[in-house]
């Protein structure tokens, strides 16, 4: 049955190539259509692999190649505008609890690893921009701008935030309803409050290996991660107005330089200023940051994964890892569907894709809520977030290290591959008991932890009533503060 089932993957980046690896494990036929001229272009970005993504990569036989390219993080130093700083052990705690280091490497290098490890490289095609998809009763038909056509039993949009597949899903839904798609409708739930500058620097003086440095101040957070071979990966989150957003779309290079030059005096540690990082920058980019969960993920034989269904700030470090989880979850459901002796019909495929969306949406909404809270807490946005970020979380000392692992609880794994030996005996079972065992070292600070619950609740009540923060976000606040210290900033 697997040989008769064909998947067309639109997009050849993290989500698309991860899915290709999963399908190879299942023996399912696939084609990857990438619109770019290269699979792994140098865009100046880094990527963070956390244990939930690392475990799936290990199941696919890829993680050791990733480990060869990284310098594992050991701890993070979080600095505030008033000069106060504290040290978080979250990277070491995650490594100990889940068996995988917090791993940072060049995004280009990671995508190249994914491509190089594929057996079926001949199934990956570049310069293939999809222009239309027809979802017929027997097959879906995909057309590209060079006139080529591909048929498929399923079409997966792994083509990012500006997904063509997602646009086609909306178009098909609206045509069926007899209405037109408005320009704003598909993106109605997406926020555009921040912009991100990211880059790579080399030989930054006084910046040690194995360390994350973060500087948090009003409206801006800067995060620096030591990589392998004297490389340092960094990103800046900056609050943007509508006018700045429009300017960024017109001239991102100029705005990136202006932003970075204006932050030169920001201290990342006693010895490292951002100007030290900027002066040794080799490549950088600036982009508006989308945040949120797209409303419709699937229709008929079409489905989206990765950034085509959700966008998160990089502070939480889960964007790529959730894309890898999507690939694994979708593969698990394909495997289950193809185990039936009957040929997969259009109805069967559509039901399977509905199940996929239902399974992933709960975790997605939780993770995106945490991400939205964290980026704003890092930027001192709002009384409650400022209280949590500047005073309560640092008072827990190393507590954020153990709390960080709670975001990994409930992570997906591949069902068609064995469990890696390095995860055995670790905190993967996803029970509250395992989470509590991770936090046992907090017993000396339980009084402080109780105070955090009380004060955080009061702070969230204040924000809900007086600052018109959505009740759902307020209710998640303490869960987010626990997870947030893992997310590239610790506080």
From Swiss-Prot:
Annotated pathway: Secondary metabolite biosynthesis
Any Pfam family hit: FAD_binding_3
Binding site for FAD: 34, 48, 107, 307, 320
Chief location bin: membrane
Protein origin, superkingdom: Eukaryota
Location in or out of the cell: Membrane
Entry GO terms, CC: membrane
The entry's keywords: FAD, Flavoprotein, Membrane, Monooxygenase, Oxidoreductase, Transmembrane, Transmembrane helix
GO molecular function, one term: FAD binding
UniProt membrane topology term: Single-pass membrane protein
Cofactor: FAD
EC number: 1.-.-.-
Transmembrane regions: 448-468
Family: Belongs to the paxM FAD-dependent monooxygenase family.
Purpose: FAD-dependent monooxygenase; part of the gene cluster that mediates the biosynthesis of paspalitrems, indole-diterpene (IDT) mycotoxins that are potent tremorgens in mammals. The geranylgeranyl diphosphate (GGPP) synthase idtG is proposed to catalyze the first step in IDT biosynthesis via catalysis of a series of iterative condensations of isopentenyl diphosphate (IPP) with dimethylallyl diphosphate (DMAPP), geranyl diphosphate (GPP), and farnesyl diphosphate (FPP), to form GGPP.
Protein name: FAD-dependent monooxygenase idtM
Protein's organism: Claviceps paspali
């Amino acid at each position: 049955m697997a040989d008769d089932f064909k998947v067309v993957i639109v997009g050849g980046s993290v989500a698309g190539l991860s899915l290709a690896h999963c399908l190879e494990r299942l023996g399912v036929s696939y084609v990857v259509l990438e619109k770019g001229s290269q699979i792994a272009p140098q865009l100046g970005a880094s990527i963070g692999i956390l244990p939930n993504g690392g475990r799936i990569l290990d199941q696919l036989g890829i993680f050791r190649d990733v480990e060869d390219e990284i310098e594992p993080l050991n701890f993070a130093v979080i600095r505030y505008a008033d000069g106060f700083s504290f040290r978080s052990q979250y990277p070491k705690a995650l490594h100990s609890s889940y068996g995988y280091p917090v791993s940072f490497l060049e995004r280009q290098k990671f995508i190249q690893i994914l491509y190089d490890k594929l057996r079926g490289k001949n199934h990956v095609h570049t310069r293939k921009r999809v222009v239309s998809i027809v979802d017929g009763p027997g097959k879906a038909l995909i057309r590209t701008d060079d006139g080529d056509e591909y048929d498929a039993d399923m079409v997966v949009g792994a083509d990012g935030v500006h997904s063509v597949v997602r646009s086609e899903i909306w178009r098909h839904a609206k045509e069926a309803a007899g209405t037109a798609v408005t320009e704003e409708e598909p993106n109605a739930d997406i926020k555009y409050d921040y912009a991100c500058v990211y880059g790579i620097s080399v030989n930054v003086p006084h910046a040690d290996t194995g360390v994350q440095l973060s500087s948090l101040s009003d409206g801006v957070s800067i995060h620096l991660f030591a990589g392998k071979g004297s490389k340092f990966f960094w990103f800046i989150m900056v609050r943007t107005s509508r006018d700045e957003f429009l300017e960024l779309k017109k001239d991102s290079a100029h705005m990136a330089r202006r932003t970075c030059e204006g932050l030169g005096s920001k201290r990342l540690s006693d010895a490292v200023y951002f100007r030290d990082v900027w002066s040794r920058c080799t490549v950088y980019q600036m982009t508006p940051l989308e945040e949120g969960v797209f409303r419709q993920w699937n229709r008929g034989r079409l489905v989206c994964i990765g950034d085509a269904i959700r966008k998160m700030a990089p502070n939480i470090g889960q964007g790529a890892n959730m894309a890898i989880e999507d690939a694994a979850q979708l593969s698990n459901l394909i495997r289950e569907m193809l185990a039936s002796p009957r040929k997969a019909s259009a109805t069967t495929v559509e039901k399977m894709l509905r199940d996929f969306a239902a399974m992933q949406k709960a975790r997605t909404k939780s993770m995106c809520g945490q991400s939205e809270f964290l980026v704003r807490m890092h930027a001192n946005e709002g009384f409650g977030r400022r209280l949590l970020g500047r005073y309560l979380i640092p008072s827990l000392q190393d507590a954020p290290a153990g709390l960080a692992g709670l975001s990994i609880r409930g992570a997906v794994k591949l069902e068609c591959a064995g469990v890696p030996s390095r995860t055995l005996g670790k905190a993967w079972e996803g029970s509250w008991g395992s989470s509590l065992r991770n936090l046992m070292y907090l017993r000396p600070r339980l009084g402080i932890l109780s105070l955090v619950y009380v004060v955080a609740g009061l702070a969230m009540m204040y924000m809900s009533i007086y600052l018109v923060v959505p009740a759902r976000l307020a209710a998640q606040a303490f869960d987010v503060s626990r997870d947030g210290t893992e997310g590239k900033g610790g506080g």
